[in-house]
Amino acid sequence: MHRYRSHTCGALRESDIDSNVRLSGWCHRIRDHGGLLFIDLRDHYGITQCVVDPDSKAFRLAETLRSEWVVKFDGRVRRRPDGTDNPELPTGAVEVFINEIEVLGEAAELPMPVFGDQEYPEEIRLKYRFLDLRRDRLHQNIMTRGKIIDSMRARMKEVGFFEFQTPILTASSPEGARDFLVPSRIHPGKFYALPQAPQQYKQLLMMSGFDRYFQIAPCFRDEDPRADRLPGEFYQLDLEMSFVTQEDVFAAMEPVITGVFEDFADGKPVTKNWPRIPFAEALRKYGTDKPDLRNPLIMQDVSEHFRGSGFKVFARMLEQEGNEVWAIPGPAGGSRAFCDRMNSWAQGEGQPGLGYIMWREGGEGAGPLANNIGPERTAAIRDQLGLKEGDAAFFVAGDPQKFWKFAGLARTKLGEELNLIDKDRFELAWIVDFPMYEYNEDEKKVDFSHNPFSMPQGGLEALQTQDPLTIKAFQYDIACNGYEIASGGIRNHKPAAMVKAFEIAGYGEETVIERFGGMYRAFQYGAPPHGGMAAGVDRIVMLLCGTNNLREISLFPMNQRAEDLLMGAPSDVTTQQLRELHIRLNLPQN
């Protein structure tokens, strides 16, 4: 028999009754039932109930066992007594009668129990992550993560992609987020950077004659903490294709992502033919470029009903060019209490309030706005939004560029409060036609809106002749249930167009050569049309595991202060290490 086990703790069945077995694992739970000791033994594969009676030579040692001790049991498999089966366990029809015990590893007093689903402070969970990872929910999430990545790899290879590994030590790129810098010992005063993404390398692969590349790529960004992003590092399914249009990328990747979701959706419906929503339409209808399409609410422009109306606040606003009034329908939200609650919520979000109209019995509009604009305009709004008695509408007004984010939050809040969001499905969509440029209010200049390497729609001619703020890019995202899970684009592969694109954003050719010299050089030697995308592995896993916390699907995450509480990172280093790197510390004064 094997030194440690003949079976795993998830393997024994009724067919094993009367077999002599050896199991090893952790003492998950210990119960004393009238002299009989019941020990649930756990390993990676499952749990087996083991029993020791007072007449067993192993009983005295069994009494000393504590939770999370690592032990080896020798015993005999028997049928559980009638009425004691546990249908929730694959091993629930049998138990092991122990006749010999060996303690393989004792455990100190636990700072948090492994048994059960009780919540514990994040600091404790991260400091003792090795215990947290033994808990079933987190353990299963990590296993699901591995299986999802396996599915991604298999599906990518099925459609002709090859996996390559791009460098981890690379050159710093000042645009975008801050780099994590790595000092060079051999080249004093110079630094490598950890890649924010393999963007330039994957484009260089296409220029090197490869056709379809992918990798599960680690990416590093020294960003301030955000609720929807882990500090430090994240992983993406990164890919690039040569000689493709935007349609080719969609045709290749939509089945891959759909298939991965279907593999792990646990029977929940997954969108088959993804809608394509232009960026501008997404903002107007949903107030976000990553809409949750499970929420049926669609915003509409109702400016015409307030222009010249008795509600002077909106009427005066609409006298200024560019201002609009948007309505968010609230089906079954037509009670004073609910409308007042939404108004209070808006004030809590830093807004002056949230105007509303309620439609009561007989279809009459009610509320301050209805009283000011009159029944005819109120009825016209109701008809435009397709509402009825018992419903409500909520209004935001002003410059859409300034209020669309809040409008999107209000739409989401209404969907949640009115229980309109079907949590048991995955709604995927392409968001297309992103603007190439936006106006940077802080720096008072035109800047890139998204990826600076994207091809402008209309190519070089558009860059030379159009108002930059009207140029759209061959840039696209994938949205799922309110999250951006992928982003990509067709690349600007012509040197003249690349230089012009950066020139519009205020960067001269010398800056392009300085920052992106390797790729710019490669463009001079025959660059194929190419494009691709990167899908966020962590967010996809998070959605499929049914959680909204990225730490619940990551092995050893940092806390929100970018600290690894288990390993003690970041840490001090020795004077000798700093001397070898020619670095002297100049720390801020407290």
Curated annotation (Swiss-Prot):
UniProt xrefs under InterPro entries: Aa-tRNA-synt_II, aa-tRNA-synth_II, aa-tRNA-synth_II/BPL/LPL, Asp-tRNA-ligase_1, Asp-tRNA-ligase_1_N, Asp/Asn-tRNA-synth_IIb, AspRS_core, GAD-like_sf
Keywords assigned by UniProt, alphabetized: Aminoacyl-tRNA synthetase, ATP-binding, Cytoplasm, Ligase, Nucleotide-binding, Protein biosynthesis
Protein biosynthesis found in the keyword field: yes
Region annotation Aspartate: where it falls in the sequence: 199-202
Any one GO cellular component localisation term in the record: cytoplasm
EC class name: ligase
Keyword Cytoplasm: yes
Classification via Pfam families: GAD (PF02938), tRNA-synt_2 (PF00152), tRNA_anti-codon (PF01336)
Reaction(s) catalysed by this chain's protein: tRNA(Asx) + L-aspartate + ATP = L-aspartyl-tRNA(Asx) + AMP + diphosphate
UniProt name for this protein: Aspartate--tRNA(Asp/Asn) ligase
Superkingdom assignment: Bacteria
Gene that this sequence comes from: aspS
GO function terms (MF aspect): aspartate-tRNA ligase activity; aspartate-tRNA(Asn) ligase activity; ATP binding; nucleic acid binding
One GO BP annotation of this record: aspartyl-tRNA aminoacylation
Residues reported to bind ATP: R221, D222, E223, E484, G536, V537, D538, R539
Subunit composition and interactions: Homodimer.
Family indicated by similarity: Belongs to the class-II aminoacyl-tRNA synthetase family. Type 1 subfamily.
Binding site for L-aspartate: E175, R221, H450, R491
CDD domains: AspRS_core, EcAspRS_like_N
Cellular localisation: Cytoplasm
EC number: 6.1.1.23
